[in-house]
Amino acid sequence: MQIITTALVCLLLAGMWPEDVDSKSMQVPFSRCCFSFAEQEIPLRAILCYRNTSSICSNEGLIFKLKRGKEACALDTVGWVQRHRKMLRHCPSKRK
């Protein structure tokens, strides 16, 4: 009887799961979005690597990983960003 009760509770909870949950972002935990972008050029010597923002983000750009443990976002359409991208390596994925 306890197994049936547990199964019913699980079904009820699953039915209450919101349907507007963004399942894509749950599948790609390493992805990130940018909401503000660097207005001035970041010196190339300060950047370790870059990665693209996720395709599910409203703003497409690059996330630069900086040497002091910080990150900065930049629009991929800006000239200096495109030049830096050609000179840098892509950041390794943190996925296991």
UniProtKB/Swiss-Prot annotation:
GO CC annotation: extracellular region; extracellular space
Induction and repression of expression: By phorbol myristate acetate (PMA).
InterPro entries in UniProt: Chemokine_b/g/d, Chemokine_CC_CS, Chemokine_IL8-like_dom, Interleukin_8-like_sf
GO terms for MF: CCR chemokine receptor binding; chemokine activity
Keywords assigned: Chemotaxis, Cytokine, Disulfide bond, Glycoprotein, Secreted, Signal
Cysteine pairings via disulfide bonds: C33-C57, C34-C73, C49-C91
Range of residues in the leader sequence: 1-23
Pfam families: IL8
Single GO biological process annotation from the record: eosinophil chemotaxis
SUPFAM superfamilies documented for this protein: Interleukin 8-like chemokines
Compartments where located: Secreted
Listed PROSITE patterns: SMALL_CYTOKINES_CC
Glycosylation sites: N52
Function: Cytokine that is chemotactic for monocytes but not for neutrophils. Binds to CCR8.
UniProt subunit comment: Monomer.
Family stated for the protein in its record: Belongs to the intercrine beta (chemokine CC) family.
Protein name: C-C motif chemokine 1
Organism per entry: Homo sapiens
